[in-house]
Design a protein with these regions (language model features):
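Tandem CBS (Bateman) regulatory domains
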Residues: 36-72, 76-85, 103-119
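The conserved cystathionine-beta-synthase
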Residues: 3-22, 27-29, 70-88, 95, ...
């Protein structure tokens, strides 16, 4: 899981995504009263590429999802999958004691649920 500042331009965020081999980034809170945000590859595709915007001229704040739904580390996988389905999301920060400790996605849910049974 990688955190970035919302003032970062999208091109720089993409370079970070490529470097850490992730399709999502956590956007840091500006202060204690702020909420976490998320930037997904799909946000970049919809808000930058599809609208023919220059990624070096668009800030992460302009296209990120915020506030975003969060999950607790102890949430059961099946409930997390239902939450994703109910709210039409594919990724969520995992927050423990007001600190982001990871990111969960449909991809990771499937890997943790089905693949262990196949081994």
């Amino acid at each position: 899981m990688t955190e970035v500042d919302g003032t970062l331009d999208v091109l720089s965020a993409l370079k970070i995504m490529k470097e850490v081999n992730e399709t999502s980034l956590i956007v840091k809170r500006r202060d204690e009263g702020d909420e976490f945000g998320m930037l997904l590859f799909s946000d970049i595709a919809k808000e930058v590429i599809a609208k023919d915007r220059a990624p070096e001229r668009v800030s992460v704040y302009e296209i990120m999802a915020k506030p975003c739904l969060t999950v607790r580390p102890e949430m059961q996988i099946r409930y997390c999958a239902r939450l994703f389905d109910n709210f039409g999301i594919s990724h969520a920060p995992v927050v423990d004691h007001d600190k982001v400790v990871g990111i969960v996605s449909y991809y990771r849910l499937v890997l943790q649920t089905i693949l262990p049974e196949l081994e």
